[in-house]
């Protein structure tokens, strides 16, 4: 759906035939706590976007690039078990809040990822990268996986708010193999992630 929406927005912009204006920095935003699970091999397909033509679509170019069809978003309460696991591992609700900046909330991305790893082990194992919605759109624009920034990572129950890096105890509590690698690094919110892929500039 998100790829469809971006394709539609690009086609409507092209149809306007308005004068092209120079753009400076671009910073996408997305639904809070939503996660996208990229399938193994998707990184190469992202790189290949730069070689596509203006009539190609993201839906076609990235078909089969996702380990799950659906992406959990904030409107969810299915992760009570995972929240309890996190609280038990870190020493209770107060300890979770002191470590990650928030109590263990069902809608938070870390608990969603933990549930998917438990209930859909094959899908999780086939995933090479987990993005938040904001870093997903940034990755599309850049044609490569981009980092989750600290402000968004603070709403995952996974980041140590003092070091602004992934919290080892929270990662372990998620019981999701290789989660640190799948998440990539946490970056400062002001960091430039790269240049826009030629795929978008030709649109």
PLM region spans:
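Glycine-rich phosphate-binding/catalytic subdomain of phosphoryl-transfer
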Residues: 6-203
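N-terminal helical capping/dimerization or prosegment-like subdomains
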Residues: 1-5
């Amino acid at each position: 759906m998100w790829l469809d929406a971006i394709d539609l927005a690009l086609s409507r912009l092209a149809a306007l035939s308005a004068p092209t204006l120079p753009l400076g920095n671009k910073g996408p935003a997305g639904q809070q706590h939503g996660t996208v699970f990229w399938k193994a091999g998707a990184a190469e397909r992202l790189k290949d976007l730069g070689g596509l033509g203006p009539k190609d679509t993201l839906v076609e170019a990235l078909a089969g690039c996702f380990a799950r069809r659906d992406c959990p978003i904030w409107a969810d309460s299915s992760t009570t078990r995972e929240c309890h696991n996190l609280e038990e591992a870190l020493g209770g609700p107060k300890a979770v809040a002191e470590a990650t900046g928030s109590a263990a909330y069902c809608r938070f991305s870390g608990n969603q990822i933990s549930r998917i790893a438990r209930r859909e082990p094959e899908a999780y194992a086939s995933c090479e990268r987990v993005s938040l919605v904001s870093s997903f759109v940034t990755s599309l624009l850049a044609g490569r996986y981009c980092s989750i920034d600290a402000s968004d990572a603070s709403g995952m129950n996974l980041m140590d708010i003092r070091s602004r890096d992934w919290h080892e105890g929270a990662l372990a509590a998620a019981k999701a193999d290789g989660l640190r690698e799948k998440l990539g690094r946490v970056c400062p919110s002001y960091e430039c992630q790269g240049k826009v892929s030629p795929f978008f500039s030709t649109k």
